[in-house]
Swiss-Prot record:
Signal peptide: none
GO molecular function: DNA binding
Gene Ontology biological process terms, A to Z: negative regulation of DNA-templated transcription
Gene3D superfamilies on file: 3.30.450.40, Heat-inducible transcription repressor hrca homolog, domain 3 (3.30.390.60), Winged helix-like DNA-binding domain superfamily/Winged helix DNA-binding domain (1.10.10.10)
Encoding gene (name): hrcA
PANTHER family from the UniProt entry: HEAT-INDUCIBLE TRANSCRIPTION REPRESSOR HRCA
Cross-referenced HAMAP family: HrcA
Function as written in the Swiss-Prot or TrEMBL entry: Negative regulator of class I heat shock genes (grpE-dnaK-dnaJ and groELS operons). Prevents heat-shock induction of these operons.
UniProt name for this protein: Heat-inducible transcription repressor HrcA
Keywords per UniProt: Repressor, Stress response, Transcription, Transcription regulation
Length: 325
């Protein structure tokens, strides 16, 4: 446990280090912050914080920078403070959904970009799990002789568009008939479905097409539940270029791999969570990930992650995610 004065000094060191990217000395703290103590007292308190491993000295500077433990202590205090704050939730995601004709993928693509522009960090948004939603309707639209567009409408009002290759030039009337059949049978996906298909179809081609349609739809819903939309990838590269070029490759490999997807999908709490450096992975000492949940409605939800250097503007990011609905 540290004293209130040590906490004030630690907060000042973290905030200056994040703002300016340089180790912080006692003289700088006095010039920038109203600490109301002598330089000797600040140096003594900084020595205490260093002994407690909250700050560390670099060989090239007389100043101190926050350690991972120091960032952790600072972030924990922020999370405690914001957990008691009531905020007005932004409904921007629902606005994007309407603007994109309820196409979830398009809305989330814009959402990831907007979050990145606001936060100035790289963002990831995980597609919601439609396996927990109910399909209300399936519409089939012929785009050209070899392509049918399947429009899946969920009970939540969200829409997915799936391209379905077809060598069979079914008429629009036939596609409407197949659409109605599939929609009516959506609640009957059991061992009798294949018998129903055989009874319904008028040709082997129709049977092949309907089975392909059902398999494509199931695969799409399963794959979409694992889709991740990235905004502002270059922002992370730029931030890391300023600190440690050698760290960029393993970090990019991590965020583009299944490991980041697994990390985000493991989020079950609606609360904001922050992982710093080696808390994420042993090879990732230079980045932090701030995660939260977003909601389209009470049942359909997904995960958000903001990724940046360990010297991140945590307060801004936490406040932003705390306002997302």
């Amino acid at each position: 446990m540290i004293t209130d004065r040590q906490l004030s000094i630690l907060n000042a060191i973290v905030e200056d280090y994040v703002d300016f990217g340089q180790p912080v000395g006692s003289k700088t703290l006095i010039e920038r912050h109203n600490l109301n103590v002598s330089p000797a007292t600040i140096r003594n308190e900084m020595k205490q914080l260093e002994d407690l491993n909250y700050i560390e000295k670099t060989h090239s500077s007389s100043g101190r920078s926050p350690s991972q433990l120091g960032f952790r202590y600072y972030v924990n205090r922020l999370l405690e403070q914001t957990s008691h704050q009531k905020t007005n939730k932004l409904r921007r995601l629902n606005q994007l959904l309407v603007e994109n004709q309820y196409d979830v993928s398009s809305a989330l693509t814009y959402f990831a970009d907007e979050l990145s522009n606001i936060s100035q960090y790289t963002t990831l948004v995980v597609h919601p799990n439609h396996k927990q939603d109910i399909i209300n309707n399936v519409h089939l639209i012929r785009a050209n002789p070899n392509l049918v567009i399947m429009v899946i409408v969920f009970s939540s009002g969200h829409v997915e568009h799936v391209h379905l290759a077809s060598d069979i030039p079914f008429s629009n009337d036939k596609l409407n008939t197949i659409s109605n059949f599939v929609t009516n049978k959506l609640t009957e996906f059991n061992q009798n479905l294949q018998d129903d298909i055989v009874s319904f179809v008028q040709s082997e081609q129709e049977e092949i097409f309907i089975n392909k349609l059902l398999n494509t739809m199931n695969n799409h819903i399963s794959n979409q539940s694992n889709s991740i939309y990235m905004g502002g990838k270059v922002k992370l590269i730029d931030a890391l270029n300023e600190s440690n070029v050698s760290s960029i490759q393993p970090i990019l490999q991590y965020i583009e791999s299944n490991r980041i997807a697994e990390l985000l999908q493991d989020i079950s709490s609606p609360n904001i969570n922050v992982k710093i450096g080696n808390e994420i992975d042993d090879s990732l000492s230079d980045i932090s990930i701030v995660t939260s949940q977003y909601h389209f409605d009470e049942t359909l939800k997904g995960q958000i992650a903001v990724i940046g250097p360990t010297a991140m503007h945590y307060q801004n990011v936490i406040q932003l995610l705390n306002r997302i609905w």
